[in-house]
Amino acid sequence: MSSFLTTVNQRTRNQFRPRASGKGGATSYQLRQYAEATLGGGSLRKVVKLPEGEDENEWLAVNMVDFYNQINLLYGAITEFCSPQTCPEMKATDEFEYLWQDTENYKRPTKMPAPAYIEQLMSWVQGNIDNEAVLPSRIGVPFPKSFPALVRQIFKRMYRVYAHIYCHHYPVIRELGLEPHLNTSFKQYVLFIDEHNLATGKDFWGPLGDLVDSMLRSD
């Protein structure tokens, strides 16, 4: 599966588009560059807070695009290790298999290999980001009333990519030297969801619940 292009949007804090790198997706060097620019240092709890005077929907939009880019690059770094043969189902642990459903092509929950699921997911998120009716490209244009609910759904679905990577590709992440970047990116994701009440229930974190609890206690 070819790597996705990182979204460039006026709301993206770091406008970074990785070069195409073939089957292997984003390179480790690219990911390190982006992580250093995006994550920085200091308390991640402070990073995720709504800045004084900032519109909440604008802040949700900025971070949604940024996390899409981070997940895109993390998964892009390990795509050659995630195939229909190695990952015939989109799973975290055996208890958590994710089925794809949308309003156009898959109106019923559909089982598919992890790469196909993730491609559908990232294309769906990209489609929402590119939709002017959902995410106006000009800052100051009002968001639709349905935007907060859509953001919750997007964050819930993007979490599944983190869960799949942690449960099925963590050894490869360590071999590539990307463990700190995965952990920092995911911790920021967890803290952002916690800060802005985006979790949709007590079972939201499922297979990574213990890791999430640890991250919430440590910041």
From Swiss-Prot:
GO molecular function, one term: protein kinase activator activity
Gene: mob1-1
Record-stated family: Belongs to the MOB1/phocein family.
GO-annotated biological processes: cell division; positive regulation of mitotic actomyosin contractile ring contraction; positive regulation of septation initiation signaling; signal transduction
Source species, domain of life: Eukaryota
Alphabetical list of Gene3D superfamilies matching this protein: MOB kinase activator
Cellular component terms per the entry's GO annotation: cytoplasm; medial cortex; new mitotic spindle pole body; nucleus; old mitotic spindle pole body; Sid2-Mob1 complex
Stretch forming the signal peptide: none
One Pfam family cited in the UniProt record for this chain: Mob1_phocein
Name this protein carries in UniProt: Probable maintenance of ploidy protein mob1
